[in-house]
A protein has these predicted regions:
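Conserved P-loop NTPase motor core
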Residues: 1-408
Length: 408
């Protein structure tokens, strides 16, 4: 019955014709009159029109606002990408197709419901840059824009100027509360911060202290990296545990005495386990007869972590040591230092012992969620990437979303 992919693109191309025909209508309007369309669209939605009904007009309005505020006009291919996102798909577009601009039309359209719309980026810089840049379009149309990054949140305010930012696109981001940033019509942020705020909200006692509102619509940039590569990465909020367990230094010493003949190492799977030879050696070093005796369950736990720290975690690659003697994790995707993050289940302590720095108290997990489970909470999820068709099956199986290749 033909290629469903080609059918979708053909259908979306027809819609582009409708949007293009509206261009002359909105070109004639003043910016003030253009902004009034937002209220008109909201009114139509209240009168039971659907987002799909108003989409051609909404997209045409965003294109016009973008031309006037940014001097950037959405190409047809960017409108096709935007429609694919609005329909809850992954839009696969060649880099250089201006993905930042592609997101504006579907974000504007979905923000009209008043339930919020999120743009998810891979790092703090992109979240702030894209928000400050594209917020000019939303602001011209009467919508507010918030940004959430590590330890800070902002709201776009053209009256506010922060001269410290060299990049003009970030100068109008005014510090605000987390709740205000989420309360904006549009919110930009990183996958880590969206996820952690969700966990923090699950630990508050009163509704007033909630940061997020409902998870309505999200566009995830670099979607293959966040939703597939990092899908099972757990986000963890922890507190110091009463039983911190001792003996990390002793186990680090034992691990140092082991050689590659004592364990099976699988770098690709990030796993390591003692073989029979290694078990015997450890038993001798610890002066015990059977490592796997139930009474030694804590020993096995410590030994496993010490072995992992010794063989799988390398200084300057997975972590660095600060001048203060603190072990700081390096993000494997961005190379950035992840201050305040610690490996769980005693692994961080094992690395501290291996490096001979102060071993900090072990922590207890209070709340945890994987990116996969967090993003499945959105009513509608979509994403952008340069290379997703290889993972098309996974996107469909895990998230129920299709990958649409947008023709250049």
């Amino acid at each position: 019955f033909g290629d469903p992919q080609a059918k979708t693109v053909k259908r979306l191309k027809k819609q582009v014709l409708a949007i293009n025909e509206l261009e002359t209508v909105y070109e004639k309007m003043s910016l003030e009159k253009l902004a009034k369309q937002t209220e008109e669209f909201k009114k139509q939605l209240k009168e039971k029109k659907s987002l799909d009904d108003i989409m051609p007009h909404a997209f045409a309005v965003v294109r016009e606002a973008s031309k006037r505020t940014l001097g950037m006009r959405h190409f047809d291919v960017q409108l096709i990408g935007g429609m694919a996102l609005h329909e809850g798909n992954v839009a696969e577009m060649k880099t250089g197709e201006g993905k930042t601009l592609v997101a504006t039309a579907p974000i504007y359209l979905n923000a009209l419901t008043g339930k919020g719309a999120h743009v998810v980026t891979v790092n703090d810089y992109l979240a702030q840059r894209d928000a400050g840049w594209m917020a000019q379009v939303y602001h011209a149309l009467g919508l507010s824009t918030g940004v959430i990054v590590a330890d800070q949140s902002f709201i776009f305010d053209p009256e506010f100027i922060n001269k410290n930012h060299v990049d003009e696109r970030m100068q109008h981001l005014k510090p605000c509360t987390r709740k205000e940033a989420y309360g904006a019509d549009v919110t930009y942020g990183t996958n880590n911060e969206f996820g952690f705020d969700y966990l923090r909200d699950n630990m508050v006692n009163t509704v007033e202290n909630l940061r997020q509102r409902e998870l309505n619509f999200a566009i995830v940039d670099e979607v293959d990296s966040i939703l597939i590569d990092e899908a099972r990465t757990p986000l963890i909020i922890s507190a110091p545990s009463v039983d911190s367990g001792s003996g990390y230094a002793m186990f680090a010493e034992v691990a140092r005495k082991l050689t590659p003949e004592d364990y099976e190492l699988d770098e690709k799977r990030r796993s390591v386990a003692l073989n029979d030879h290694g078990v015997e050696k450890v038993q001798k070093l610890l002066k015990i007869s059977n490592l796997y005796d139930p009474e030694h369950i804590r020993l096995i736990y410590h030994m496993d972590q010490a072995l992992k720290a010794q063989t799988l975690f390398r200084r300057e690659k997975e972590y660095v040591i600060t001048k203060e003697g603190e072990i700081v994790i390096v993000d494997e995707f961005t190379g950035r230092l992840m201050h305040g993050r610690r490996y769980n289940e005693g692994l961080h302590q094992a690395i501290e012992a291996k490096e001979g720095v102060e071993v900090q108290q072990e922590s207890m997990t209070l709340a945890t969620i994987s990116f996969q489970n967090y993003f499945r909470l959105y009513d509608k999820l979509s994403g952008m990437t340069g290379t997703a068709s290889t993972e098309a099956e996974e996107f469909n199986q895990i998230y129920g979303i299709d990958v649409i290749e947008i023709p250049a």
